[in-house]
Amino acid sequence: LIHVITKKGKGYEPAEKNPDKFHATSAFNKETGKSLKEKKDDYSKIFGDELVKLAKKNDKIVAITAAMRDGTGLTNFAKEFPNRFFDVAIAEQHALTMAAGMAKEGLIPVVSIYSSFYQRAYDQIIYDICTQKLHVVMCIDRAGVVGNDGETHQGMFDLAFLNIIPNITIMAPKDFIELRQMLEFAVNYNGPIAIRYPRGGEEKTKFLTHKSIEKGKAEILKEGADVSIIAIGKMVAKAQNIAEILENKGIDAEVINARFIKPLDKETIIKSIEKTENVITIEDGTIEGGLGTVIEELILEENLKNVKFKKFGYPDRFIKHGKTEEIEDIFGLTEKNIVEYVEKCNEKVVDRVNALVIQ
């Protein structure tokens, strides 16, 4: 047996001193080790900063991650609260089971792990947390397409694999402000709750209103009569942009920020579908079992007649490495493609004799 002990970053002093920082680095100055790319706010940083603020008000809040302190934005939390921060190393199963134990004893564990790595702890989420209805806040970083992080890190499946678990509540913010709102809601909740958010920064689209978070309640961002656009997470910005483009083309779109996929705001969504009889869903994840599937099932369960319906998301396949914009273009998730679909759909003469038209 040969036991080889390695040192991350060996031979390059800046990497030896900051192994987490150099885990997945972009171009940097080789003399100083500093990144050449200007650091901007991203979802991970906003999450970490907000958690520090909440933890200062509530000493029951603890943070857990699996070897990704810096990547998940918990660097400052670890410095501020060293006795309330737990890095369990590459042991996601242990992270969730430990969180369950902490919740059982009255603490409020906030677990931050990448979407693709939550898969490793699926059994623990089901049996250690959700079966017992324990208050564990599961923050799902790198949800959706992650671009240059690569194929193994694409966070395609979290909405689908979490949505089938009883007792869990699942949210996704449209921007930084809504992430802060959802995190505050989650730490004051009582039960298993998950927040998914993407890699990188928020979209350029700015939202004028941010209603308070209410469990299972969607947000109508724009009322319309011709088509219902239901989106979740980062795709809400895309939905808003699409609605503006369609308005200039004479098509009146209603935009709904789902906010929650579980519980789903059935009342708001049903009213919208009955009004427009034309609905599309947009999500940053697999369409198999995600938001689109949930809406499709709702249409069938409620026996809504004469509805045109289309899901926009990622297909039943593994998504290769590539820039986010390129991947969205390949799979038809661009504003241009979705606008063209709605235009064609609006022009069609559809047989509306008691038919659900799923395209």
What are these regions (language model features)?
Residues 106:
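Conserved G/P- and acidic residue-centered "switch" motifs that form tight phosphate/ATP-binding loops
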Residues 88-89, 113-114, 172-175, 282-284:
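Short beta->alpha connector loops at strand-helix junctions that form conserved
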Residues 148-165, 172, 176-187:
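Internal gly/pro-rich beta-alpha loop/helix module
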